[in-house]
């Protein structure tokens, strides 16, 4: 379990450094080797998933959404246009729904009874929050927890984001600055993943 806690922290530190000057590990690894290591580390998160809700949603095409806490009105507009287009499809949005804009996207999905996967940065809820109960009862919601954290922390948030990205077929970000942990996630996925990875702009 300790290993699982360390993984997202190590990935963030290592990949952030390698994006600029290179770390000791990354200096000796080619792109394919980095991609293989990244894939193996993230895949391990799947063995620690707890699920509650409609598990069949995992069999659908998943799109991950990540938004910075510093999202601008323009970011919000682009995100709402994006989620509107998603609601015209059978795709399922997976996200931590933690930042203000991510919460707004969740509300949009709930209002339209569109399915979503809520990746938690903590253990599963003992009781479904009232505002999510209808979606849960309708089979439009699945909670995922990557275990080990009784409450939300920075480390658990990183673990949650990496895990959600691993499950997704496509990954979308709003704009972020270089100090954001989303920068590290985007850099790793864009360079070493064969998934669709885009920034809304």
Question: Locations of the language-model features?
Answer:
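Glycine-biased, small-residue-rich flexible motifs in mid-sequence functional cores and linkers
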Residues: 17, 22-201
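Short hydrophobic alpha-helical segments enriched in small aliphatic residues
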Residues: 6-7, 13, 21
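Short loop/turn and low-complexity linker motifs enriched in small/turn-promoting residues
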Residues: 2-3
